[in-house]
Amino acid sequence: DAPGQPNTKALAQLKRLIRLAEETGLYLNLTGLGCYHKKEVPAWYHKLGETDRWKTQAHFWAAIAKVGADSPAIFCYDLMNEPILPGKKKATDWLAGEFGGKHFVQRIALDLTGRTRQQVAKAWVDKLVAAIRRQDQRHMITVGVIPWALTFPGAKPLFYAPEVGEKLDFVSVHFYPKTGEVDKALKALAVYDVGKPLVIEEMFPLKCGLPELARFVTQSAKTADGWTGFYWGRTLEEYQADKPSLKSALMLQWLDYFRTNAPARSQSPRKQ
C-alpha cells in the first residue's frame, strides 16, 4: 500500500493460496516484485529512488517470508523475474521493453554511479536475502535470470558469479531455444553450471517446436537438476474439450509432454 506498509488483503490471499497448495499437494515458487502491467504499478513505487526502492522491496520480501515460513508447500522464493542492470549510460525507466502487453524484465538500478555491475547485483541480492532470512531460515532462495550467454557468446553469469550469488541456494535460468539452435542453447546452459543445483525455471516451445524443446530437455539433464514450465490454470482435459485452435493445440501438446515425461513424486507437501 505504501513504503513499509504491506497490503494485508494481499497477504491474506497468499495465506489462502499456500493452504490450498498444502491441501492439493503442490509446491510453490513464489516469484516477487513483478511489475508486469505497467499501468498497475503504484505511482509512489515507480517514483522511488534506488535506496528507497530496495528498502521497499526488502519490506515486501520480509512480509512474504513471514507468511510462508512454516509451510511445507513453499519450494522457493524467487527474488525477481529476470532482473537486469543498466549499461554505462543511466537508464530512465525501471521497466524494460514490453512483450505481449507485459513488462517481464525489470531493472534493479538506473545508474551504476561508479559501481561495478557485480557490486550492484551483490548489494541487491544480499539485502533481499537478509530480509527473507530474518523471517524464514528454512526455504530456498533464487533469482530467475535471462541466459545472456545465449545472446552474447562468452557472457558470464552475473547474479550467479561467485562474488554475487553466494547467498542464493540454486541457479534458476530461463530458456526458449530457437529452431535449429538447440546445441547453442545447451552450450549456453553449461555456462550456468557453477557448482550449485541448476533449475531451468522457464521453458516453452515458443521459438521452436516441441520435438526440439524435448531434445533440449533430454540433453540438458547432464547439467540441469530440474525443469519447470508454464501452466495457465487449465487442465489437459479442458484443452482436449476445446474447439480446435492453434493455441489449444500448442498447450495440449505441451501439457501432454510435461505429464508424460515428469518423474513421479515420492511425497506431497502436506502440512502435518
Predicted regions mapped to residue ranges:
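Low-complexity, intrinsically disordered/propeptide-like segments
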Residues: L20-E23, L189, F258
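Charged/polar, solvent-exposed surface patches and flexible loops
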Residues: H59, K102-H103, K187, V191, ...
